[in-house]
Design a protein with these regions (language model features):
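Conserved catalytic cores of very large enzyme subunits
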Residues: 1-295, 316, 320-479, 483-486
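Generic secondary-structure boundary/loop-capping signal
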Residues: 42, 232, 295-300, 491, ...
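Metallocofactor- and cofactor-centric catalytic cores in central/energy metabolism, strongly enriched
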Residues: 66-70, 74, 312, 504, ...
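Sequence-pattern detector for short linear motifs
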Residues: 203-205, 306, 498
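Extended amphipathic alpha-helical segments enriched in small hydrophobics
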Residues: 297, 303-310
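Glycine-centered flexibility sites
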Residues: 302-305, 421, 492, 503
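Glycine-rich phosphate/pyrophosphate-binding loops
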Residues: 312-321, 498-506
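Intrinsic, low-complexity terminal and presequence regions
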Residues: 460-479, 485-524
Length: 524
């Protein structure tokens, strides 16, 4: 966008490269609105604060003007403009400080290379980030939280924990749970190697290095053509032994591969036939190099219900020693298969912890109807109270397993690092953290002591039509008795619980929230 503007389709309005801050933000909105019409998943912009900071100085904007522009951008990003009256699913990566790979690059204004380098614009970056923090915390006219864009912050080894300019980040995380944190302290990845496309698709660009060279350090142009989710509980229920389980899993993975290969061919055909005109324009350089538009996009295979697979196969969950051992074995099996698929096809494959906002409920419901006796995550509630069934997400522990956060992190650390496509640990808390220092220390402790790549802090809060933000879960306001909207993270994004599907509502009722205390968050 900064080099070429928003254009590329005959007969449609074209924009030149932006020369001003508000124009750049406006083109980002238009781009995401339009691209949501060509793909079903999320879109993301990386290095947003770094790349936009020079516009602030060139426009000679003060803080009030920057905040007004950011406010317009955020409100526009939360308008339901996609099919089904949904809001475009968007993610942005914010650097906070100028990354080394941009520091000495010349800035782009109006599509032209200027004399200054991005490393000279830290003050303007601070203005953008402060404005973004404040806008996101203030919410809309009724105090509701903004769902999009979901901001991702990279926590690196040289992260400046004592920077006072980041105080708004910790407040935003503690009050609403808005940010996603990407852990690079204990990772062998660097931020320039990875890109967060949606709430969890974390792409290892080193797989692309021999194809794209350094291009992808600054310009991702990558993603996923689609996800096929493997129903592990059903395979386990049908199987009578581990050997049969792996045989069926192998068959399902082959089916997933064939499905994704067919889809890739169809996407190439449709793109060549101008059915994805904007995608065709922005991926044209990829096509010029490989004769394929989607060459740098991954075929993604996901999984769901590892805990219930263990229950159906062994009658013990993933929280046991045997259950976790089996989960690690299955993950290694799937990783090996995906590597083989990649070698056979020449296409990129990855393994993802599928978000499964709807799949966890839909598959469990279908399995309960078609497989008598199959175990779901909330079997007791299903039989005793008629609760809607659901499966646990990917290889995660049951949501009511424990209220000890670090017990969960200890258990999940090895499993989380097995995913090559994306995964997230959500730290569900009953209410906000009142102390920003505690929030900061929690993030620091997790990143320092664990290898898990991606996590959020997700407090429950309520919105009263009269009093706005209310701490914790209150379906009626404790002050005035009005009905409240109760907010929590359904999986990747924050939504009112009342709008969740029945399966996820059943999950919310059984969730144990983690106890986060100041003493447990001290950095060791």
């Amino acid at each position: 966008l900064l080099l070429e503007g928003f254009k590329g389709v005959k007969g449609k309005v074209e924009s030149k490269p932006p020369k001003h801050f508000r124009t750049a933000l406006g083109q980002m909105v238009n781009f995401l609105y339009t691209m949501q019409g060509e793909s079903a998943g999320a879109q993301a912009f990386s290095n947003v604060d770094t790349l936009l900071a020079p516009f602030v100085r060139y426009d000679n904007l003060n803080y009030k003007q920057v905040k007004q522009a950011i406010q317009e951008f955020v409100f526009n990003m939360n308008v339901p403009t996609r099919v089904g009256f949904q809001t475009p699913f968007s993610n942005i990566t914010m650097d906070l400080s100028v990354p080394s790979y941009y520091a000495k690059q010349n800035v782009i204004i109006g599509g032209e290379i200027m004399e200054e380098t991005y490393g000279e614009f830290q003050t303007e970056m601070d203005m953008i980030n402060k404005a973004f923090f404040e806008v996101m915390m203030q919410g809309d006219a009724s105090g509701r939280v903004f769902t999009f864009p979901i901001p991702t912050y990279n926590i690196t080894k040289d992260f400046d924990w004592n920077n006072e300019n980041f105080s708004g980040l910790w407040e935003m995380a503690a009050k609403y749970g808005i940010p996603n944190f990407s852990n690079f302290i204990n990772s062998d990845l660097n931020p320039e190697d990875a890109r967060s496309m949606c709430c969890r698709l974390r792409i290892d660009n080193r797989e692309l290095a021999y194809r794209g060279g350094g291009l992808f350090g600054s310009n991702p142009l990558t993603g996923s053509i689609g996800v096929v989710t493997i129903n592990l509980p059903q395979i386990a229920y049908i199987s009578k032994s581990k050997e049969e389980f792996y045989k069926l899993l192998n068959e399902r993975m082959l089916l997933a591969k064939n499905s994704l290969e067919i889809k890739r061919k169809l996407l190439e055909k449709f793109t060549n036939n101008n059915l994805y005109p904007y995608t065709k324009f922005y991926l044209r350089d990829i096509y010029a190099r490989f004769k394929q538009y989607w060459k740098n996009h991954f075929s993604t295979i996901g999984l769901i219900g590892m805990n219930e697979a263990c229950l159906n196969l062994f009658n013990e969950g993933i929280g046991t020693e045997n259950g976790k051992k089996f989960a690690v074995e299955v993950m290694d099996f799937m990783r090996a298969k995906i590597t083989k698929f990649q070698e056979e096809t020449g296409n990129n494959y990855n393994l993802e912890a599928t978000p499964a906002e709807g799949t966890s409920y839909r598959l469990a419901k279908l399995d309960k109807e078609n497989h008598t006796g199959i175990i779901c995550s909330n079997d007791r509630e299903y039989y005793e109270r008629g609760a809607q069934p659901y499966y646990s997400n990917s290889t995660q522990l049951p949501v009511n397993y424990t209220d000890d956060l670090f017990e969960v992190l200890d258990h999940q650390d090895e499993l989380q690092t097995k995913y090559t496509g994306g995964t997230t640990i959500h730290i569900f808390a009953g209410e906000r953290i009142s102390n920003n220092e505690t929030m900061k220390n929690l993030v620091r402790k997790i990143c320092t002591n664990y290898k898990l790549p991606y996590f959020t802090f997700s407090p429950t809060f309520s919105i009263c039509p009269n009093h706005g933000y209310v701490v914790g879960e209150h379906f009626t306001c404790p002050e005035c008795g009005e009905d409240c909207e109760v907010y929590s993270r359904i999986v990747g994004y924050i939504r009112p619980v009342q709008q969740w599907n029945k399966g996820k509502q059943a999950e919310f009722k059984t969730r144990k929230t983690y106890v986060v205390e100041e003493k447990t968050c001290k950095v060791c």
